[in-house]
C-alpha cells in the first residue's frame, strides 16, 4: 500500500518524501477541506454531495427491493430472467463461502507457533557498496542474542506472511475476466479473515484490498454499488495486508490476462527485486531509489504498435512499517535523488515499485474508498458535536484503530447513513481520506511489493513465496 507523494527540494536536489498522514486532497469525493482557526468546516456544496450520495444509495436499495417483489410475483411455472440472474451469483457465492469455511487457519496448521521463514537474503545484506554494512552479523553472538529476543515479533510477521501467501495462491486460482471487483475483494477478504482467524484488533486485515485498474495505480477498492467488472484487457494491482497484533504484511502483485502486458509487469517485478537486493542495514534510501529507477527504465513495452519506456511513478514510494502503523515515517523512493537517511537495525520496510506507460506521476481521481485515522491525533480528544460522528468514531476505534479501512467494511458492521459523519471526521482531521491515485487515462500501471525484516543477523524477505 503506497504512501503519499514526494516533493522536489527548492534547488532540485534530494526529493523529500511527504508522509501520507499529511496528504490532504482537494474535494470530499476528491476530499476537499475548508480550514478555519480552530476547526475544520465543511463547504455547503460538499454537504449536498454527501446527502445526495446517501439518497442515491437509499434509492438503489429501494429499487432492488421492488425488483425482488416483482420477481416474486412472476407466477408459478414462469421463468423470470431477473430472478434467475440473481440466483446464479448467490449460489456461486455460497459455494465459495463453503470452500473458505473448510480452510484451516494458519495457527492451526502450525500448532507449535513456528511459522515458515521468509527468504533470508544474506549475501546481499552483508555486502554494502562501500563496506558500510558489517560482515559478521550472522556469526556475532551479541547480534544472535538480540535477534532471539525479538523472536515473538518475527513469528507474528511470519504468521501474517504465511496467510498472505496462501490467500494469494487461492486468489490466483479463480480470478478471471467477467468477475466484479466487489466479488474479487469480498472473496479475497473472506479468505484472509478465515486464514488469519480474525479477532478484533488482535488479528485481521491490515488495510482494504486494493484492486486498482490500468491507469489507476493505487487506493482503489469498490464502494457499495460499484458495478465495475474485470476485463481481459485490464492490468489489475492486487494490494492487501494482513496483521497479527498490529505486525502487518504489506505485499502486492499484478494480475493481467493479455500477454502484451508481460514486459510491463516483468519490468516492475525486476525493479522491486532490485530494490530488495539493494536494501539493508546502513543502506541509504536514495541508493535504493537509484537502482530501482535504473532497472525499471531499462525496459520497454510495445502496446498497439507504439513503444514506451517503463517509467517509475516518482511520487509513489515504499515505506517503513511499525506496529498498527502502515506508514511509519521513512519513505523508500523509486527514483534517484531521494533522502540520504539510512535503513536501521530492527526496522521493517515495504519495498514496492510502480511502473507506468504514462507520465510516471499520479494525482487524486475518482471516488474515495480508503480512509485511515490520523496517527498523530490518535490519542487526542477532539470535540464532536454530532452524535452520529461520535458513534462512527467509536466504531472506528473499536474495529480499526489506526489501521486503514474502507466504506465496505463500515457497511459490513451494519452502520448506515454514515457519510455525513465520516465527512465530519475528515473535516476535523481525525480521519484522513486517501483517494485513488491515477496517472493519465489510457496508460497502464503495474506494481509489485514485499515486506522485509531488518533483523540483527539477516535481512528476511518475510512475504516472499514460490510465486514472487
Swiss-Prot record:
Biased composition regions of type Basic and acidic residues, renumbered to the chain: 63-74
Gene3D superfamilies, alphabetized: Creatinase/methionine aminopeptidase superfamily, Winged helix-like DNA-binding domain superfamily/Winged helix DNA-binding domain
EC number: 3.4.11.18
Binding, substrate: 219, 327
Entry keywords, A to Z: Aminopeptidase, Cytoplasm, Hydrolase, Metal-binding, Protease
PANTHER family, alphabetized: METHIONINE AMINOPEPTIDASE 2
NCBIfam families linked: met_pdase_II (TIGR00501)
Stated name of the protein: Methionine aminopeptidase 2
Amino acid at each position: 500500500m503506497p504512501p503519499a507523494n514526494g516533493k522536489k527540494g527548492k534547488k532540485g536536489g534530494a526529493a523529500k518524501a511527504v508522509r501520507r498522514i499529511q496528504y490532504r486532497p482537494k474535494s470530499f469525493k476528491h476530499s476537499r477541506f475548508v480550514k478555519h482557526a480552530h476547526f475544520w468546516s465543511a463547504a455547503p456544496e460538499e454537504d449536498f454531495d454527501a446527502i445526495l450520495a446517501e439518497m442515491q444509495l437509499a434509492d438503489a436499495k429501494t429499487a432492488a427491493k421492488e425488483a425482488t417483489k416483482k420477481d416474486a410475483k412472476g407466477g408459478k411455472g414462469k421463468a423470470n430472467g431477473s430472478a434467475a440472474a440473481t440466483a446464479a451469483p448467490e449460489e456461486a457465492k455460497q459455494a465459495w463461502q463453503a470452500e473458505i469455511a473448510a480452510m484451516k487457519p494458519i495457527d492451526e496448521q502450525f500448532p507449535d507457533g513456528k511459522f515458515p521463514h521468509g527468504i533470508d537474503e544474506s549475501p546481499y545484506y552483508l555486502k554494502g557498496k562501500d563496506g558500510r554494512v558489517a560482515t559478521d552479523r550472522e556469526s556475532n553472538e551479541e547480534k544472535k542474542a538480540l535477534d532471539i529476543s525479538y523472536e515473538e515479533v518475527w513469528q507474528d510477521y511470519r504468521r501474517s506472511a504465511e496467510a498472505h501467501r496462501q490467500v494469494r495462491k487461492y486468489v490466483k486460482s479463480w480470478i478471471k475476466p467477467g468477475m466484479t471487483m466487489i466479488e474479487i475483494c469480498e472473496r479475497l477478504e473472506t479468505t484472509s479473515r478465515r486464514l488469519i482467524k480474525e479477532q478484533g484488533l488482535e488479528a485481521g486485515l491490515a488495510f482494504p484490498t486494493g484492486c486498482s485498474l490500468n491507469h489507476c495505480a493505487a487506493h482503489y477498492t469498490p464502494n457499495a454499488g460499484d458495478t465495475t467488472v474485470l476485463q481481459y484487457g485490464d492490468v489489475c494491482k492486487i494490494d492487501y495486508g494482513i496483521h497479527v497484533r498490529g505486525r502487518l504484511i504489506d505485499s502486492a502483485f499484478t494480475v493481467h490476462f493479455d500477454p502484451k502486458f508481460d514486459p510491463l509487469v516483468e519490468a516492475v517485478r525486476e525493479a522491486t527485486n532490485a530494490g530488495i537486493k539493494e536494501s539493508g542495514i546502513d543502506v541509504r534510501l536514495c541508493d535504493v531509489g537509484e537502482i530501482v529507477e535504473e532497472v525499471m527504465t531499462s525496459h520497454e513495452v510495445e502496446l498497439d504498435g507504439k513503444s514506451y519506456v517503463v517509467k517509475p511513478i516518482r511520487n509513489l514510494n515504499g515505506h517503513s512499517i511499525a506496529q498498527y502503523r502502515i506508514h511509519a515515517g521513512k519513505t523508500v523512493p523509486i527514483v534517484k535523488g531521494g533522502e540520504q537517511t539510512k535503513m536501521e537495525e530492527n526496522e521493517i520496510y515495504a519495498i514496492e515499485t510502480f511502473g507506468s506507460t504514462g507520465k510516471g506521476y499520479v494525482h487524486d481521481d475518482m471516488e474515495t474508498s480508503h480512509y485511515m485515522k490520523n496517527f498523530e491525533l490518535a490519542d487526542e480528544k477532539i470535540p464532536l458535536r454530532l452524535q452520529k460522528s461520535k458513534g462512527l468514531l467509536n466504531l472506528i476505534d473499536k474495529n480499526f484503530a489506526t489501521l486503514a479501512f474502507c466504506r465496505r467494511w463500515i457497511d459490513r458492521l451494519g452502520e448506515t447513513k454514515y457519510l455525513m459523519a465520516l465527512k465530519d471526521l475528515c473535516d476535523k482531521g481525525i480521519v484522513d481520506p486517501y483517494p485513488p491515485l491515477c496517472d493519465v487515462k489510457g496508460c497502464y500501471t503495474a506494481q509489485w511489493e514485499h515486506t522485509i525484516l531488518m533483523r540483527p543477523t539477516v535481512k528476511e524477505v518475510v512475504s516472499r513465496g514460490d510465486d514472487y
